[in-house]
């Protein structure tokens, strides 16, 4: 069967190509005397035949915060066992929060249409406060922290604060229900649990407090459960018991300070993600 070559529906303008990050990267490679690439195909070909040079150059060009180490790649016949930057040290949150401007970092619209905007400064300050709170709760590098959370600015703050310490983040949606959440959360033995006070579905606000209380009581490793606001009615967290605390109260004892980032090995875990669980327990 013969298929005629078709023209693309859209092509970027010359000006847009000039401003593209990939164009800037190619110019950087040329100045660094690593190659002169006329088009994307040439860059791609070089990237897969000169893997170490490509990723080392990308680290430098991207101004990655951390230490690259002296080895870019430890190859292996089985790709899953190959290691990039085996001696490197890095912190995910440090690189996310490395913005030099105070423009919007997060623009969030809930299901009802309410709009929330957080600047980079507001995001940094919130992560600073939460990091201090988590350290006070004993969270350390390598610990697991879980969330039963929807997409929201508070979820992003929690993720960044956890990763800033070098701890590992895992989450699932609150509409999973108790059984599905328990199947996942119980496996990783989190020290701290984050839960939204509720979530929105089909125009309705649904409370998340019962599932937070049930998980807190059923997972022995959980020492603290932090409830952040999403629904528009202040939540009663008394069912959670003494381990439960509102986000605002959890952060209240601390003042904003410079964040200390715990750099971890480049190949250390950042997230724990689960399979669907359709063929047994989630893995």
Where is each model-derived feature located?
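Conserved S/T- and glycine-rich ATP-binding loop of Class I adenylate-forming
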Residues: 145, 162, 269, 275-278
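AMP-dependent adenylate-forming
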Residues: 32-35, 93-119, 229-235
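N-terminal amphipathic, basic-rich helices that act as targeting or association modules
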Residues: 2-73, 77-80
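A short N-terminal helical cap/helix-turn-helix that marks the beginning
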Residues: 56-69, 86-107, 267
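Conserved AMP-binding/adenylate-forming core of the ANL superfamily
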Residues: 41-46, 106-160, 177-182, 242-249
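Conserved pre-ATP/AMP-binding loop-to-beta segment of ANL
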Residues: 102-104, 226-227, 238-274, 281
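Structural core segment of the AMP-binding/adenylate-forming
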Residues: 164-247
């Amino acid at each position: 069967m013969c298929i005629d070559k078709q023209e693309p529906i859209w092509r970027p303008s010359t000006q847009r190509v000039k401003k593209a990050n990939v164009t800037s990267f190619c110019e950087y490679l040329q100045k660094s005397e690593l190659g002169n690439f006329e088009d994307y195909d040439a860059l791609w070909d070089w990237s897969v035949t000169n893997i170490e040079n490509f990723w080392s150059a990308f680290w430098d060009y991207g101004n990655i915060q951390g230490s690259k180490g002296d080895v870019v790649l430890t190859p292996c016949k089985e790709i899953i066992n190959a290691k990039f930057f085996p001696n490197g040290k890095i912190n995910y949150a440090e690189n996310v929060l490395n913005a030099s401007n105070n423009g919007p970092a997060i623009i969030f619209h809930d299901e009802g249409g309410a709009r929330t905007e957080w600047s980079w400064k507001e995001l940094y300050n919130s992560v600073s406060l939460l990091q201090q709170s988590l350290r006070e709760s004993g969270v350390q590098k390598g610990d697991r922290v879980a969330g039963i959370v929807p997409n929201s600015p508070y979820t992003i703050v929690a993720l960044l604060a956890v990763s800033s310490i070098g701890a590992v983040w895992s989450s699932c949606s609150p509409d999973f229900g108790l059984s599905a959440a328990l199947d996942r959360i119980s496996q990783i033995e989190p020290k701290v649990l984050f839960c939204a006070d509720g979530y929105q579905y089909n125009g309705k606000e649904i409370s998340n407090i019962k599932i937070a209380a049930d998980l807190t009581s059923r997972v022995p490793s959980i020492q603290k459960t932090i409830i952040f606001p999403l629904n528009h009615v202040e939540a009663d967290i008394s069912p959670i018991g003494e381990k439960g605390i509102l986000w605002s109260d959890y952060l209240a004892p601390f003042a904003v300070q410079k964040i200390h980032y715990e750099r971890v090995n480049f190949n250390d875990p950042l997230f724990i993600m689960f399979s669907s669980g359709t063929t047994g327990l989630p893995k």
